[in-house]
Amino acid sequence: MAQEETRQRFALVAGEASGDLLAGLLLDGLKTRWPQMQAVGIGGPQMLRRGFESWWPQEKLAVRGYVEVLRHYAEIAGIRRQLKARLLREGAELFIGVDAPDFNLDLEAGLRERGMKTAHFVCPSIWAWRPERVQKLRAAVDHVLCIFPFEPALLAKQGIAASYVGHPLANVIPMAPDRAAARTALGLDAEAPVVALLPGSRRSELRYLGDRFLAAAALMQQARPELRFVLPALPSLRGEVEQLIAGSAMKGRVQLIDGRSHAALAACDVTLIASGTATLEAALFKRPMVIAYNMNPMSWALMRRKQLQPWVGLPNILCGEFVVPELIQEAATPQGLAEATLAWLASPDKVHALQQRFSALHAELQRDTPTLCADAIQKVLEG
């Protein structure tokens, strides 16, 4: 058995920061189950810390929106072709696509056609945006690792094998975050009201939301001079964020921190945040938020036609109602964003009720994700 384990090789692709975090926890489970395993493909810093060998920088795939993807399509398609060829040439027991369905599903289908077993971690949001992906998913994967409890039953109806593994973030983020410790770590005043600005982890998001968030922050500070602002930025985007801040009315008034979005969310009283996985992180930190979403108008028009639910933000989708405000496209004005964010600071009773709701959601998502992932992967390998 030990000799067999030395040959265990997994290939993974995580296309953005949120996928990197999920994949890091997946690798924890795989490493515990198969201590001698190797993992290769495309990943970010969380994966690299666990010994992952990344063949391309993760940032190459971190593009969002139809128009934005078209701009980079040739490069992304080239990476996918080269990756597929190398995996088929060098071999792997299993390919696991971590989120990034636009990139991974085609790759998974191509590898599966050639006999490689495949799994997908994070069910594509067929229940929210893209129902046509069901057929593609069925053809592409042997198994889906689902992070939301209602997804396996939906996939079973479509003949797709799936397991609920819990949401890894629910184990990473404490049930009762330590605001005081986070503020001490960031050098923030213990009593000052703090707003966390999270305009997104992709360049396209930063382009559409960065200026708006900073303009909203300026309006908030005019209304409440005692406010403090923190903005976590990935190292790869720090230069661009610094330029945005320097050219805004918030120059010298925003504390820019490297990565550490969790520290910012733990420390803050409220967050102004781009739609995406970070909104679920904010919910697990029990923080009130205002969700913003802005992209190329053509991309939004195409996406809106495929929308199946009235919500965009994950906290609202999971709660089945608007528990936090969403300001989308034209509604995401600096004035609107500022007013909605300040409203939370003036409504402690509403904040308390929201925290109770988010605590229940946290408990529902909390599972032993690394072990459940390894269990599911082992079944695929043995199947």
Regions found by a protein language model. Name each.
Residues M1-G383:
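Nucleotide-activated sugar donor-binding and catalytic core shared by glycosyltransferases
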